Amino acid sequence: MIWLVLFGALFRSVSDIPGFTTGSYVEFLTPGLIMMLAISSAGWAGMAYIEDMNAGVMDRFLVSPIWRGALNAGSAAQNVIIIVLQSVIVAVLSLVVGGHFPNGVAGVAVMIAIAALLGASFASLSNALALVVRQRESLIGAVTSVTLPLTFLSTAFMQQSLVPSWIAWVARFNPVNWAVVAGRSAATGNTDWTLVLSRCGLLVGLLLVSAWLATRSFSAYQRSI
């Protein structure tokens, strides 16, 4: 919320730059902040796994007849609920400080669903990493070294046509940018549904790979005990 208020006020005049496609910077910024919030929140999902390992809870889970994928799905679902609630708060605050969503509630709902999809992917990756490293410090270092670079190497804060060409090139392969572009297109008018669906398809693929890695990582953990 602080990012929205401060950045929205500080860079208000950015929307006057030729080539900027939204009516206000707050309107442009909101989808980017929601996606940043999603990966920041989901990135810590693995901390719960580490706590369970230290307390011996994880070992009891692994000797029970529970599908390993269900453990990851439960963790990801918990994080998705949190992300949805946080995203709703940010969207409402955006309206309060002058933002506008031309596509209404439906567009905002699609944007939040995309954030949930991104968050579920990162929660699964966090769980996979936690099962491999099994240390808080290692997970904290990995999350903090990935979250902000992925955000700034996207179009979360600036129009793609206005960023350096190398950042625009990197953003093409950045899942955070996939979500930002799709969410912004869905919520802020002039929606390109082909673009939205294609980026959502990439995010679904990322989620499937992430969930598979998280499930397979239980084997690495079991071999270590």
PLM-predicted stretches and their roles:
Residues 152-209:
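Membrane-interfacial helix-loop-helix junctions in multi-pass membrane proteins
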Residues 9-16, 51, 60, 64, ...:
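Transmembrane helix-loop junction
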Residues 216-225:
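Short cytosolic juxtamembrane segments of multi-pass membrane proteins
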Residues 13-23, 99-103, 190-193:
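Short extramembrane helix-to-coil loop segments that connect adjacent transmembrane helices in Major
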Residues 2-9, 25-97, 117, 126, ...:
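Hydrophobic alpha-helical transmembrane segments of multi-pass membrane transport proteins
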Residues 9-13, 130-173, 177:
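Transmembrane helix segments
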Residues 1-24, 224:
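Hydrophobic alpha-helical transmembrane segments
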Residues 68-143, 193-215:
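Alpha-helical transmembrane segments and their short interhelical loops
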